[in-house]
């Protein structure tokens, strides 16, 4: 097998940049991040307006619209964008970021329903914009406000009141250009691996927060019946009878539990990754569950979680925030790296796990955020375990097979190119199907 050259560990500046990047990308979120980001823009627009709007107009990119149509909104028992927008304008606080709706009350929910009934919210598709684009215009009498979020879920790039521009960061290149910031630290497989394996433990211990928060989400899910109850199915009578009771089924059940609750609109915070709560869940809980089953050390858990989360961030750098490719493919690839490491795998075997993942479930489409995402996450976790097992046996999808390259970084670029470029027509067709249904 091809061995990697050893290298001197990275300089302090790069270490600091990576830690900053992780803190930017791994953050708490309540509810699916797309409708929550729309609620955030609505909250900001209402704050700028200075009063409750009489009318709210929302213009969204296709990917935002797709991911917000069928998912539960936390604490409402309702699905979709109108209630997210209404609550954003009524009780949302932009300072809360992706927890913008955490002050929800029954009274506010009732008021939000009335706003919808009065047809004071109008939502439309906006063409030829970034894949992550949210524009909200609020009005009351002669007063108006306008807010644009672009490229990232909390990235407010434009604020206007009564025709006067208060903020316009588009001119600074913060922009709605999906290529992102040219000064952004660009990761590689070796950088990710070396950082996770060699950083002083106390400097990366913070990644345990992902385990604490996402475990609580999984535990809370088991107290009710959320979504399609994928987790309870795996651990139920038939699940135990036909799938058994093992480290494998434990990680399936724990991961699906958090996703079941989140996609059904439970008021449960999770630690997200790269703008996605499901990605944060899938990068965390399979690794945590497996670590607990094999009773590994705290250091091993920290390094496995860091490897998983940073790998997801790396892959998302070239894939982009939103795409036609299901995010669980990316997140489960990170999890497979963490699991392989916990099995005792070395750098080469971890690279094998990545190639095995790419050779298996590349092409799984994203057809919006919804309760059935828990099934897709479970498929990703299942493949993560299989890929790790094969890697430990030094079995890997070879460069003569499909999109796999001898170089692991090139294999990742092949994956993300398919997701960001090759599946654009798929993305459009999926949205056409979703918006054309009678239900």
Regions found by a protein language model. Give the residues of each.
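A structural signal for small-residue-enriched, beta-sheet-centric alpha/beta enzyme cores
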Residues: 29-33, 63-64, 152-154, 159-161, ...
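Conserved phosphate/anionic-ligand binding catalytic regions in large, soluble enzymes, centered on
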Residues: 28-44, 268-285, 326-331
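Acidic-glycine-rich active-site phosphate/pyrophosphate-binding loop
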Residues: 10-19, 51-64, 246-265, 297-315, ...
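Flexible, glycine/charged-enriched surface loops at secondary-structure junctions
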Residues: 52-56, 96-101, 123-124, 202-208, ...
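Short, small-residue-biased leader/transition segments that mark boundaries at the very start
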Residues: 1-3
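Hydrophobic alpha-helical bundle architecture
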Residues: 46, 290-303, 313-379, 392-402
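Signature of multi-pass transmembrane helix bundles
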Residues: 117-265, 431-439
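Early transmembrane hairpin of solute transport permeases
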Residues: 39-138
């Amino acid at each position: 097998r091809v061995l990697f050259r050893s290298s001197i560990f990275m300089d302090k500046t790069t270490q600091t940049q990576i830690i900053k990047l992780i803190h930017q990308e791994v953050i708490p979120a309540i509810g699916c991040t797309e409708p929550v980001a729309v609620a955030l823009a609505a909250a900001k627009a209402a704050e700028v307006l200075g009063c409750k709007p009489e009318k709210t107009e929302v213009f969204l990119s296709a990917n935002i619209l797709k991911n917000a149509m069928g998912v539960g909104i936390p604490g409402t028992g309702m699905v979709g964008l109108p209630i997210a927008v209404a609550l954003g304008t009524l009780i949302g606080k932009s300072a809360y970021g992706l927890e913008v709706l955490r002050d929800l009350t029954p009274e506010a929910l009732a008021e939000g329903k009335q706003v919808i009934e009065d047809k004071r919210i109008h939502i439309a598709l906006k063409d030829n914009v970034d894949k992550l684009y949210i524009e909200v215009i609020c009005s009351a009498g002669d007063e108006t406000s306008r807010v644009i979020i672009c490229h990232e879920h909390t990235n407010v790039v434009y604020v206007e009141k009564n025709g006067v521009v208060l903020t316009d960061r588009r001119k600074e290149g913060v922009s709605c250009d999906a290529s992102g910031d040219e000064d952004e630290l660009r990761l590689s497989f070796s950088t990710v691996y070396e950082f996770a394996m060699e950083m002083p433990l106390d400097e990366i211990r913070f990644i345990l927060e992902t385990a604490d928060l996402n475990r609580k989400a999984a535990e809370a899910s088991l107290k009710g019946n959320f979504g399609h109850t994928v987790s309870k199915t795996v651990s139920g009578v038939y699940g135990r009878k036909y799938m058994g009771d093992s480290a494998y089924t434990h990680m399936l059940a724990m991961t699906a539990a958090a996703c079941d609750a989140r996609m059904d609109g439970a008021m449960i915070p999770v630690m997200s990754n790269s703008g996605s709560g499901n990605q944060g869940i899938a990068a965390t809980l399979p690794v945590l569950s497996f670590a607990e089953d094999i009773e590994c050390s705290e250091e091993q858990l920290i390094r496995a979680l860091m490897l998983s989360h940073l790998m997801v961030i790396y892959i998302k750098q070239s894939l982009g925030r939103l795409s036609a490719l299901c995010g669980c493919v990316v997140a489960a690839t990170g999890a497979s790296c963490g699991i392989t490491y916990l099995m005792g795998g070395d750098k080469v075997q971890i690279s094998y796990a990545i190639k095995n993942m790419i050779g298996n479930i590349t092409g799984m489409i994203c057809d919006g955020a919804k309760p059935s995402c828990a099934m897709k996450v479970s498929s990703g976790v299942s493949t993560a375990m299989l890929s790790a097992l094969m890697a430990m046996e030094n079995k890997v999808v070879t460069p003569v097979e499909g999109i796999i390259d001898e170089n692991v970084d090139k294999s990742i670029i092949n994956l993300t190119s398919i997701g960001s470029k090759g599946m654009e027509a798929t993305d459009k067709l999926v949205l056409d199907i979703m918006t054309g249904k009678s239900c």
